[in-house]
Regions:
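Disordered inhibitory propeptide/activation segment of secreted metzincin zinc metalloprotease zymogens
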Residues: 32-143, 259-262
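C-terminal motif of bacterial Sec signal peptides marking the signal peptidase cleavage site
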Residues: 16-19
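Catalytic zinc-binding patch centered on the HExxH motif and its immediate surroundings
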Residues: 145, 173-204
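Bacterial signal peptide processing site
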Residues: 21-24
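The catalytic-center signature of Zn2+-dependent metalloproteases
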Residues: 218, 223-286
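Surface-exposed patches in mature extracellular/periplasmic domains of secreted proteins
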Residues: 158-173, 236-243
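Active-site scaffold of zinc-dependent metalloenzymes
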Residues: 192-217, 273-276, 293-295
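Zn2+-dependent metallopeptidase catalytic core
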Residues: 142-166
Length: 298
């Protein structure tokens, strides 16, 4: 799969929206996304749906397009939850996984045709976000994944934003704002993650990672940080080209706009944590543009 997932605000370094991330065994990386990545293999944060014929009806494809997301290769699939239950969902742009109802709730606020470093109005209200790392059954986070989640949360909290995270580990996820879990059992091929965009001032709840057992903790930290980014409203930094994945495809403005974030580049940012694809050489840290964007929005 080729997801890297992030939200309707193009890339932390530039946009907010939700999506997924995956690793591709090529010299280009994608997170639900980089031509300039030369270390290790490249992965996207989700399935390579852009290369797969869609299984959706025209009305649903039109709905996706109305949100300024790309309907190319969009797929209906089951989203498996940590307790083993599942629900119908739609995978868009490789690593954005949302139910049809969630998709319908996304608001359109206009958009820009500029390149990267943008934001939308789909943000999380100032709050403490309760986040749980799932530890039960076949979808439990491994020890390395738990450590990576701790590092990812620490990266966000040390910025002193008007959102912060309160992290616990366990199985009682129903009353938490966000749950991070290992869904490799239902994603046996590929490596990466997936998530969705915020709604109603709240973050997207479900953050999946999978196929990361052969990666070091820094790479896992990168994927988790990326997917959390989608969940609080960031879109892929290279949404306008998916260049990190070796592609030249515009993902669209994802319904909530694409407003340039002051102080960040308008072109390709090769080290942003919100690139669509990732490689085995990631360090899991925000770059300076990611931090600028986070501080501007939150």
């Amino acid at each position: 799969m080729k997801f890297r997932k992030l939200l309707i605000i193009p890339a932390i370094c530039g946009m907010v929206f939700v999506s997924c991330e995956k690793d591709n065994d090529t010299n280009n990386a994608e997170v639900a996304d980089t031509n300039e990545v030369t270390t290790g293999s490249l992965e996207t944060l989700g399935d390579n749906t852009d290369l797969t014929p869609t299984n959706l009806d025209q009305a649903t494809l039109d709905l996706i397009a109305s949100k300024h997301l790309s309907p190319i290769g969009a797929q209906e699939e089951l989203r498996y939850l940590p307790d083993g239950t599942s629900e119908k969902a739609i995978r868009i742009e490789g690593d954005i996984v949302m139910t049809k109802a969630e998709l319908e709730e996304l608001e359109f606020n206009g958009y820009s045709n500029e390149n990267a470093q943008y934001s939308t109005n789909a943000l999380v209200s100032p709050q403490t976000i309760t986040i749980i790392g799932y530890t039960g059954g076949s979808q439990a986070l491994t020890s390395s994944e738990q450590t990576a989640l701790q590092w990812a949360v620490a990266n966000y909290n040390r910025l002193n934003l008007n959102i912060n995270f309160s992290l616990t580990f366990g199985t009682n996820y129903q009353n938490k704002d966000m749950v991070v879990y290992n869904n490799t059992v239902n994603n046996p091929s590929g490596a990466g993650g997936s998530a969705g965009f915020p709604s109603g001032g709240n973050p997207h709840k479900f953050v999946q990672i999978y196929g990361l057992s052969n990666y070091n903790t820094n790479v896992i930290e990168h994927v988790i940080t990326h997917e959390i980014g989608h969940s609080v409203g960031f879109r892929h930094t290279d949404y306008f080209s998916r260049q990190s994945c070796g592609q030249n495809t515009n993902e669209g403005t994802a319904g909530v706009g694409a407003n340039h974030i002051p102080g960040t580049p308008t072109g390709y940012d090769s080290t942003s944590i919100m690139l669509a694809c990732f490689s085995s050489g990631e360090d899991g840290e925000f770059n300076s543009n990611d931090i600028t964007a986070l501080n501007y929005l939150y």
